[in-house]
Amino acid sequence: MNHWLRRLLPIAAVLSSAGALMANQVGAMAYTSGSTGYDISYPQCGGPYPSGGFGIVGVNGGYPFVYYNPCLNDQYSHTTNAALYINTGYDPSYTQVDGKHSTAECVTQSATITGSSAHQAAWAVGCSEASRSIAYATSQGASSPSSWWLDVETGNSWSSTDLSLNQYTIQGIVDTLLRQAPAAVGVYSTAYQWRTIVGNLPVSGVLADWVATGSTSAGRARATCGTGFSGRPVWFVQYLHAGFDTNYTC
């Protein structure tokens, strides 16, 4: 993942609250406060691997849908306690059922979502982003991550006129991850970017924040452990060290 330079909506399928709680508990136990790890993706293809107690590997190639990390299998297999992150976004073109974007299955599921037809279409976009990312990760042998993370950044496409479309998209991703690949789900962003993309609109099912600090100082990054953006606890703060995105566990 490039560092920062580079409530409640209905869930489409019925989730077991006990199962979701178990996934969250398992995810929380996977990380030890004070430990450090890293995140890598397609920009690190062919390069050396950093060391750390855990790693978070990118599934996509910077954008949702048609771009994927060609080195996912190798990076995931070389990563201790590997988690996965997916790129996210919303654009009207993503609502097309064209074999690349929204899936017919997600569009069908979206009919159960309370909201306008545009909201349902946005939820289906998120559902499809998650489904296609899960399918690609599974095809690359990355099928049991310790947690899933949504990369929510302004560098990708989002609606600037109706933030609820972004909200429904993100909710669709979270709902689908919890249903198809049960594990803790968190969000990578900054307070500014999260506010720009979803404002104060709620997203349910998110367990934790992963904060991009843009800092090269571990000390300054650690000082932001109490400053999240979604209202959830901060699990990780990211900073740049020795050419790699490094993550400190709060």
What kind of region is each of these model predictions?
Residues 1-28:
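Secretory targeting and sorting signals
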Residues 18, 76, 134, 174-178:
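Non-transmembrane alpha-helical segments in soluble domains
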Residues 29-50, 201-250:
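Functionally critical loop-and-helix segments that line ligand-binding/catalytic clefts
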Residues 31-169:
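Substrate-binding cleft of extracellular glycoside hydrolase catalytic domains
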Residues 72-75, 98-104, 197-203, 222-226:
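Short, aromatic/basic amphipathic alpha-helical patches
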Residues 107-122, 167-175, 203-229:
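Acidic, His- and aromatic-enriched active-site or binding-groove loops in soluble protein domains
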Residues 178-196, 207-213:
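Aromatic-lined carbohydrate-recognition surfaces of secreted/lumenal glycan-active proteins
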